């Protein structure tokens, strides 16, 4: 992808819309099948959403996404945001970060989950910087503190 083809957005501070109770999941896929980590995250998002009167939204970026969207619905997504563009047919972290950041800034989800894969870690770090927001990495469990409106992340510790 050349620089004139990129979707460029300025760095903006991300602020959650307090009324928007949505939990988004970045849906990774390989060869027209959702990745296992995405299915796990959809399941976790579904349990968090059910406990907090929220909805689950899957974010699909790429090309030819219809079958993947149907699969995501069967694993607990209430809605799918598809960014279907021929320039996004193959994973390119800069292009995917541009597309995801635009969607996040527009929709303002309360939580955004990304799998701890090679591509997911790269994308998550870039989004955190672009959106000037926090990043909880390598979580083994997620809980909601509904009284304080906090997402609590459990991580393993050594030492």
Where are these regions (language model features)?
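N-terminal glycine-rich FAD/FM-binding segment characteristic of electron-transfer flavoproteins
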Residues: 1-159
